[in-house]
Amino acid sequence: MGRVFMVDLEGNIYICKLCKTHLSTDQDIMSKSFQCKNGRAYLFNNVVNVSVGEKEDRMMITGLHNVVDIFCVGCGSNVGWKYEFAHEKSQKYKEGKSVLELYKISGPHDSNDLVSDGDDA
């Protein structure tokens, strides 16, 4: 296997809670109102330093989606999922976007975002 090159981000960054690998920035947040099994999650336009799992259809609150789990390249931890295909027309905006689960990441949200309640997505 080849060498893994990691991207270092600048600004207000979100990192893997386990190994501190950079994952995204606050500028890439599209929505703070997502839910996962273990609490809140954010939808990001761009996520770096992740690998993807197998594609699968998954039934979510907003309908059926084709997704891949995403894993931190630093430690292999599952940090969320990426939308590959949305079956519902109203959900097409999610295609190609990634969701990071807040309990698996650290970042700017740790200071004040966790105080507010998000809507289910």
UniProtKB/Swiss-Prot annotation:
It comes from the Eukaryota. Zn(2+) binds at C16, C19, C72, C75. It holds the Pfam family Yippee-Mis18. Keywords: Metal-binding, Zinc. The keyword Acyltransferase does not apply. InterPro entries: Yippee, Yippee/Mis18/Cereblon, Yippee_fam. The keyword Zinc applies. Residues 12-109 form the Yippee domain. GO terms for molecular function: metal ion binding. Disulfide bonds: none annotated. PANTHER family: PROTEIN YIPPEE-LIKE CG15309-RELATED. Belongs to the yippee family. This is Protein yippee-like At3g55890. The lineage of its organism: Eukaryota, Viridiplantae, Streptophyta, Embryophyta, Tracheophyta.
